Amino acid sequence: MRETLYDFCIRTGQQTLLQEWDAKQNAPLTPKDLSYGSKKKVWWRCAHGHVWQAMVTIRTANHSGCPYCSHQRPWPGENDLTSQFPKIATQWDMEKNASLTPEMVTRYSNRCVWWRCEKGHSWKTPVRTRTHAACGCPYCAGRKVLKGFNDLFTCMPEIAAQWHPTLNGTLTPYDVTHGSKKKVWWICEQGHVWCASIASRTGGKRCGCPVCAGKVKAQKQAYHAKMIAEHKKNDR
């Protein structure tokens, strides 16, 4: 047999491995019975009382430690989502996540799970995005559009009425949030056409038709009219 785990730890000064050897669960096996490169899975117990299984070679070659102390695995009441971020854990979608619970993931897990906010919006995102980046519901925050809740037509129908029917292609007022920075085409009651971001129309300034407001020169408006005429011609 190659050098035993016991001799290896003494020679390399890694007595911590001997201290973490779970004598009770591994009995009658001892560190003197296995080589330091053994692929046998044995039990370990860290100084904080966490218990786990790992191959001997994983511990000696990779210098891996307790998966709970390093937050690679959840330990209920210590590093799980519920105990560390109880408020966020209340938005855990129990139905869509099936048997997975907030106690089964670490607080900064990269695992993608389902959430449901107080208003009933459902979305999927990694646990870490919620706890580390402090991101909440994307619909309530206006980062994603939800028809009937934060889309332009629902929130500001009077502005949506000026949405150009052809120049925006298949995009409709239902497909964008009322605070979107996306630039789209508009047409006023007088038939003037212009391009502006949705946010500039719905924000504090509530910018309307620049032609009616006298902000656009006749030359520029004529150019827009020519371009639109060519667009209609190409669509035929």
Feature names for model-found ranges:
Residues M1-R236:
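Functional cation/ligand-contacting sites centered on basic and imidazole/sulfhydryl donors
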